[in-house]
Structures are given as C-alpha cells and as structure tokens.
C-alpha cells in the first residue's frame, strides 16, 4: 500500500534516462542518512549511530510543505494534498529550512521528545534548538527565523502536518533510535551542532548525486526499512568510495624511517617527534626551529602517531601561499601513502588543484555542471547545484581528502560566516592540522588562526604549528586559544626562551622542551649594507661572473621588474619570479627555479641570477650562494637568509654565505622619508618604518646573523616597540599608524570570525549573504583577471589545456583593483565573451572581482586595454617572462 509520505517528492531534477521523474522524499532522506552513517571519522560526543542516522533523516522534513511541493506542479502530491492550487497563484511561503525548523521545534516536538528526553537533567527547548538548526541549516548557512519562522506554522497545512507525523513514525521504525541522554556538559551540545551541520551538508551533497542514488518510484520506498537496508546503505558505501572518501586503514607507526626511508640520520627535532610522550586527547604542538631542520618531517611523524593512536584520520597541511603549497604537494607525493596500510587508496588533494589529484576524488565533482538551478532562496536550490558550484574550484576539495595540501585560507574559511563553512570545518575535523610558516601571517590571519585552533580542539582535533621562530606572546596566544577550545579557561604563561623549542599543550598541561639544532645548521651569515640599487647591480654582476647562484629579493613586483631591466643593461638574462604571472606561466617558472636552485641542482644550471619577490621566502627548497635583498622586518631577513648555503655542496663561487641588504643607513636620528628615499616600494609595503629602522640597526650593528643563538634575541629586541630608543621621533608617526592598523585588523578579525560558543546559529556570525568576509585583509582590494586570446573569432583561455575549466584557472592573474577595475570587451565581441564565460562556474560569472581580460598581440608581447576605477583608460602588457606590467 502506498504511504502518504511517498507522495511527496524530495528531488525533481531527473537526469537523462532516469526511470522516474521524481525521487520520493523518504527515499532521499534515507539516502542521505545512509551516507552520514558511513562517513568515516570519530564522533565528537557520545551518541548512538542509530540515533545519529535518525536525526540526519529529519534534515529535509521542511519539504512537507505546500510552497515547496508547488515548485514542481507536475509532481504535486495530489493524493495527500488534493488538487494543485491555481497555477496563477501557487502557494508561497518560507523556504523549507525554516519550515523544517518550525516542524522540529514546535509542531513535532511531542513526537521527538522521547528521542531527546527532557526532565530535570534532560534536554531543554534551547538545547534541542541547537540540533534542529544544524539539521535544517544544511544549505550553507544556519536558518534565520525572523518573521518567516512565526509564519511557518500557518504554512504547514493539516495534510503536510499529518504526512510529517507519519514520516517521523516511519523513521523511528527504520532506525529504532535509543534515547539520547543530554550530555553532562552543555558545551558538548554546542560543539556538536557545528559538527552535525557539516556532516549533514556533506551527506546531503553525496546523497543528492543521481549517478550514485538514481531516482526510484514511490513503490520502491513503500517499505522504508527495506529500502534503507537493501538500497540506500549499499549505494552509500559505493558512493563514498567513488567520492574518494571511503575509510582508509591507517598504517601502524614504525618510526620516522617508515615514512621517510631516505632519512639516514634523523635530526634532533625529528628524534624528539618520534619519542615524545603525547598528552591524552587533542593536543597542540608548536615547533620552532631553523630552516632545514626537518620540521615538516617531524610534523608528519607526529601526525602519523596521532593517526595510529586513533586521534586523527588524516592530515591537512596549510601553507601561506600557493607556491609553498605546490612545493609541499611535491614533497608529499612520494610519502603520503606510507601513512596508510597497503591496499588503501587514500585521497590526496592540492587545495588549488594545480597537480594530479586522486582520480576517485575528482569523480566527486565530475558531471556536476548539470542544468543551472532556478534562482531563489539558497535553501531551496538543489544540492546538486551546490556540489557542482562549490566543488568546481579545485582549491575547495582538499579539506575533504584524507590528505590535503593547500593555503591556510581554505581552512580559515571554516571559521568565517561564509557559505559551507561547516562543510569545511567538518573536513578539518578529525585530521591532524599542520600549519607551516606561522610567522608569515599578519595580525588579522593570526586572529583567524587562533579561532580555527579553538574550533579544531573543541571538535576533537589536534594541530601542529611550524615556524622559524615566534614571539613568546604570539606562541602563548595560540596555545591559550587551543586550550580554550578544550574548555580550559585559565590562561597559561609560557616562560621558555630557548631556541630551537618544542611546545606541547593538552587539556591537562603545557610543556616546553628545548632542542638541539641540526648538525651543520649553526652558522654565521655575514650581513653587508648596500646603499642603493646601483650598488646591488654591481655586486650581482661581479658574483655572476664567478659562476655564483645569486638571488635578489625585492619587496614589490614593480621593483623586481625594474631590477631585471637594470641587469639586462649589463648583458645578463636573469629569471623573474613573482605573483603577477598567469598561473600557467608561474608554475613553469616555479619548476625552472627548483631545477636551477633546488636541492639537486648542479653545474651550469646554478650559474644563474634570480630576481624574485617574497614568494621565495617560504617553504621552497632552494639554495643560493649569494643573496641581495631589500630591507625588510628582521624576521623576514632571517627567513630569506635561510636560503643561503642551505644544502651541502662542493666548493662554491663565493667564500661564505653573505646577505647584502639594500638599505639606507640606520642613523640615530633618521628623517621622516628615511626609507622612502631609497626604497619607495618598500615604504608602501612595510608601513612601520620604525620597525624597518630597528631591523637595520640590529643586523648592521652585529654585522652577521648567527643561528641559532641570534634568533630569539633578534626577534624580541626588534619587535619591542616600547624599549628605550625604539621609536625615533621622525618615524614615530608611521609606527603609531601601523600599530593602530594592526589593532584595527585584530578587531575586524574578532568581528568577522564565528563564535564557537553560540553554536550553529545566525547569532554566531554575520551570515548575511551580501557580506564579503575575507580570509586576508588587503589594504587594496584585488581583482582576478582571466587572460584570454581571440582565435578564429572565438575567445579562448590564454592557457592551453584540454579541460576548459582548468584552462581558465591556469589563465588567472591577480592585480590590485586600483590599477585595473574593468576590462571592456571590444565592440562586436560581446556574444563571443558570453560564450567564453559559459564555461566558467556560476560564482566566477557573477563576481565583480573576476574579469575577462582579452589580450591582443603587439609584437613579442600582449597588450591589454583596461580601465581604472575612475574609468580612466590604462594599458597593461603581458608576456611569459615578465608577467603583467605597465608602460
């Protein structure tokens, strides 16, 4: 006999060849519940999986409503609701997430109370609300009751109410959920709400894919229990495997060499990682050590131990830039499988998708670009559309893979009020989160990172932070943020000032362990001041004649391009590496940089000069004989110096490691324009000119950087703005302005990040869909240019790739919006432009920050006609060796 519930449709976008035009609502929710029950990973609270499955099955209960069912007139459930209303006046009302919230919280409360029992120590209405919002808000944001919530009881007609009641009874019969006693700690319900929202979103995404869950007839789900066990569960198992998310068995930890067999002699920090006693429960480890000490291998060793101890089921490595993520992906490609047992095929993903991804994981988004949904409330857009648009950008996949590598931004989006934040949060949950180059993040991102650590700890995750060195205050801030997520309210004071240093924090204690430096790393780098660019060119020309591998690190792209032009006037052909290249060219240059200056480089390949921006500061395993650098804050100078004489080699073309710093002399009483007179670009990048002055004063006074003994003292003295003589009067204004901006950034970050303790709720953050919440604060907003060419009347991507979407991604270059705000399409090519954009994702098509930039051949380079924000015409030039430049 046909049940009244099966008359209601849950999905109504049949693929070609589908045996049914609709997918019954009970079938869809059972598909999703089956996926949720099989998604691998730990549960953040004690809950029976039968109860969890039952709860997830309630996620779309709001579809028992006339307004939702009326969206597809031909699928109207006439058996339950009578004839379809007037076609000219279809039922209207709140989206189905709000209807669901009302049904769960009010209309069906009596039926659901036995599952979440009340009483003196039991569930309160407020407690249950956290669970209902997590289930109803599975379309990217928590439901916002406002006025519509008050209306939704009126919208649920008697026929819908009766069907919803029968549906709940059916689901209880299928899952037979035991009552879930209220957790002893109220905070457990709050943190569970974040996790449940992410799980439900992910399960709904997978459970909505027709290739994995084809539509069935109402008769097929007439017996819900038979459908669940005989249909939904087997398909869910196959779907998770096809998505690259099936459980991967962890390999037993056998020591560092089990992961890295080529390492003959572990470094001190690696030996520490092998043997240190890890605290019970989630832990935070902070490793501060020299460049080249093996921090990454030590972190992966700790991660493997956590995985083997069932405290993590994967790893996500977060880095500051795409270049560093690319380099880390390459380093992991040969070793990540050692984390898992033979026969496992774990997913490996690069956050911005510029390298080979696991084919099964890629399958999760293939075919997702089906028909575009009707525009309207996001809660009523089909889940397939969210899957396709949300996953179309490769960088978003990494958080769901067993092993992911990407920029920290991708993880930080998990704690910002952006769509699908909880899906990202769920992706991080349960993994060992490794964050590299922590010193490279500004105050805004550090506040975001602190929030992420709190969320991660609350959901049972462990984290490992890597840095050359951190100010003690910052290290304490991150440790306390993590422990706050564990419920520890008392702040911990960190006392140890040794270097290298390893810090481990758990719920019960914090330990600080001094470590020895790696043998061969302690050294002294001579520091020499150069008065200007001309002096730098002379030293580079001389060094190049001797066959030295030389790098000149400039603080702006424009200065880097100028430096290349100056060197070319001396008959040299330096390589240029910066962030203003199309991705396809940037990746090629990156490969060439690693070939010429990487660990395995030798001979004539190394007789080169590289001019680069800050992209060479972090995680690229490259090594130079001589370095010239523009003046920068001392921590960056130390980081850059780490690229000198990094690898063991034979005789070099210069007598010893030397850091040549282009800088004005740090006189006792500098003028207001002290830095701008010599390095105007640097003055605009590093706004605290007193910090630059203190950096110059200290390194030139010492005449060398001795590691490791100088690391901590240099950082502490330069960053102490309150010390006597730290603020020359003429530079005090710039220092105060920079400090005020730093406090402002921290304040903005505090406003932007989600509030863990409010649970998954609209009050936890500014969830307004029209509000843009960035992971990084930019002094100047940027736009993304998608470079294009006109070929045989068609506009095609600048990059050549058989995958059109990938080709467009490889054609991207970011530029400050004040320089290019728009790229007008030439008259007559408007239709060609629209055709080209049809291959873009919907977000890219609609974003005002993504521009189609048509290049025109002009001699041996390309010309781009664009406009500034005030509509003033501007001409830019592009070629694969220089990047984007202006006349």
Regions of interest found by a model, annotated:
Residues 1-19, 24-251:
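Accessory nucleic-acid engagement/destabilization modules that flank
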Residues 252-288:
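Conserved pre-motif I regulatory segment
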Residues 281-303, 437, 441-442, 467:
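Walker A/P-loop
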Residues 314-336, 350-356, 470-474, 557:
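Conserved Walker A/P-loop ATP-binding site and its immediately adjacent core
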Residues 332-402, 408-412:
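A substrate-engagement module of RecA-like helicase motors
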Residues 426-432, 439-513:
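Post-DEXD/H (motif II) to motif III coupling segment of the RecA-like Helicase ATP-binding lobe
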Residues 475, 534-601, 624, 628-887:
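C-terminal helicase lobe and adjacent C-terminal extensions/tails of nucleic-acid helicase motors
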Residues 486-560:
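Conserved interdomain linker/interface between the two RecA-like ATPase lobes of SF2 helicase motors
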């Amino acid at each position: 006999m046909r049940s009244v519930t099966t008359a209601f449709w849950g999905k109504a976008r049949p693929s070609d060849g589908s045996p049914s035009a609709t997918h019954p609502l009970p079938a869809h929710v059972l598909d999703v519940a089956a996926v949720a029950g099989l998604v691998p990973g730990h549960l953040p609270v004690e809950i029976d999986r039968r109860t969890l499955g039952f709860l997830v099955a309630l996620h779309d209960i709001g579809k028992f409503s006339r307004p939702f069912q009326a969206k597809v007139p031909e699928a109207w459930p006439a058996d339950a609701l009578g004839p379809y209303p007037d076609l000219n006046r279809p039922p209207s009302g709140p989206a189905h997430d709000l209807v669901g919230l009302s049904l769960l919280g009010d209309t069906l409360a009596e039926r659901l109370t036995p599952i979440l029992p009340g009483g003196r120590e039991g569930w309160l209405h407020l407690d249950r609300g956290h669970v209902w919002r997590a289930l109803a808000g599975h379309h990217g944001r928590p439901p916002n009751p406002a006025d519509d919530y008050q209306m939704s009881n009126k919208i649920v007609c008697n026929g819908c109410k009766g069907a919803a009641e029968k549906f709940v009874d059916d689901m209880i019969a299928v899952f037979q959920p035991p009552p879930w006693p209220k957790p002893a700690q109220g905070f457990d319900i709050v943190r569970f709400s974040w996790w449940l929202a992410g799980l439900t979103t992910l399960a709904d995404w997978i459970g909505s894919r027709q290739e994995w869950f084809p539509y069935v007839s109402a008769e097929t789900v007439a017996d819900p229990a038979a459908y669940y066990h005989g249909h939904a569960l087997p398909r869910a198992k196959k779907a998770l495997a096809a998505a690259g998310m099936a459980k991967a068995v962890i390999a037993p930890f056998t020591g560092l060499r089990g992961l890295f067999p080529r390492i003959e002699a572990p470094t001190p920090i690696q030996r520490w990682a092998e043997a240190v006693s890890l605290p019970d429960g989630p832990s935070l480890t902070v490793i501060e050590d020299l460049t080249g000490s093996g921090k990454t291998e030590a972190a992966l060793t700790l991660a493997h131990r956590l995985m083997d101890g069932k405290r993590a089921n994967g790893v996500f490595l977060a880095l500051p830039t795409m270049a560093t993520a690319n380099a880390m992906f390459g380093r992991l490609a040969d070793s990540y499988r050692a984390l898992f047992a033979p026969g496992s095929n774990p997913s490996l993903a690069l956050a911005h998708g510029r390298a080979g991804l696991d084919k099964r994981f890629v399958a999760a988004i293939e075919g997702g670009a089906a028909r575009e949904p009707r525009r309207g409330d996001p809660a009523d857009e089909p889940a397939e559309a969210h899957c396709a648009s949300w996953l179309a950008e490769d960088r978003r996949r990494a958080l769901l893979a067993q092993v992911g590598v990407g920029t920290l931004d991708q993880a930080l989006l998990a704690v910002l009020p952006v769509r699908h934040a909880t899906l990202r949060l769920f992706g991080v949950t349960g993994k060992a989160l490794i964050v590299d180059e922590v010193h490279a993040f500004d105050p805004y991102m550090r506040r975001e990172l602190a929030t992420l650590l709190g969320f991660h700890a609350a959901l049972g995750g462990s984290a490992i932070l890597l840095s050359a060195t951190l100010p003690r205050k910052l290290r304490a801030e991150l440790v306390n943020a993590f422990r706050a997520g564990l419920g520890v309210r008392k702040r911990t004071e960190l006392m140890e000032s040794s270097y290298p240093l390893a810090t481990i924090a758990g719920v019960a204690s914090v330990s600080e362990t001094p470590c020895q430096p790696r043998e061969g790393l302690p050294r002294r780098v001579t520091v020499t001041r150069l008065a200007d660019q001309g002096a730098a060119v002379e030293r580079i020309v001389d060094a190049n004649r001797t066959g030295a591998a030389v790098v000149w690190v400039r603080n702006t792209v424009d200065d880097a391009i100028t430096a290349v032009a100056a060197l070319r006037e001396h008959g040299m052909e330096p390589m240029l590496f910066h962030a203003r290249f199309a991705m396809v060219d940037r990746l090629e240059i990156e490969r060439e940089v690693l070939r010429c200056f990487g660990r395995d480089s030798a001979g004539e390949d190394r007789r080169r000069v590289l001019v680069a921006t800050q992209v060479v500061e972090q995680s690229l395993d490259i090594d130079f004989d001589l370095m010239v650098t523009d003046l920068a804050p001392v921590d960056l100078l130390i980081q850059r110096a780490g690229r000198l004489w990094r690898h063991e080699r034979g005789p070099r073309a210069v007598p010893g490691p030397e850091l040549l710093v282009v800088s004005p002399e740090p006189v006792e009483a500098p003028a207001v324009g002290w830095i701008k007179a010599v390095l105007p670009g640097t003055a605009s990048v590093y706004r605290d000119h007193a910090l630059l002055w203190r950096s110059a004063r200290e390194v030139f006074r010492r005449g060398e950087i001795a590691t490791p003994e100088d690391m901590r003292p240099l950082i502490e003295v330069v960053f102490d703005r309150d010390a006597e003589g730290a603020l020359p009067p003429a530079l005090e204004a710039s220092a105060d302005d920079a400090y005020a901006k730093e406090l402002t950034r921290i304040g903005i970050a505090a406003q932007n990040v989600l509030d863990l303790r409010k649970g998954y709720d609209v009050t936890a953050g500014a969830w307004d869909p029209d509000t843009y919440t960035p992971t990084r604060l930019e002094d100047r907003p940027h736009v993304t240019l998608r470079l294009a060419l006109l070929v045989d009347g068609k506009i095609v991507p600048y990059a050549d790739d058989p995958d059109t979407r990938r080709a467009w991604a490889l054609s991207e270059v970011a530029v400050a919006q004040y320089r290019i705000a728009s790229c007008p399409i030439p008259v007559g090519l408007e239709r060609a432009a629209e055709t080209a954009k049809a291959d873009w994702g919907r977000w890219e098509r609609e974003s005002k920050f993504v521009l189609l930039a048509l290049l025109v051949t002009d001699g041996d380079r390309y010309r781009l006609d664009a406009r500034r924000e005030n509509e003033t015409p501007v001409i830019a030039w592009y070629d694969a060796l220089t990047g984007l430049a202006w006349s």
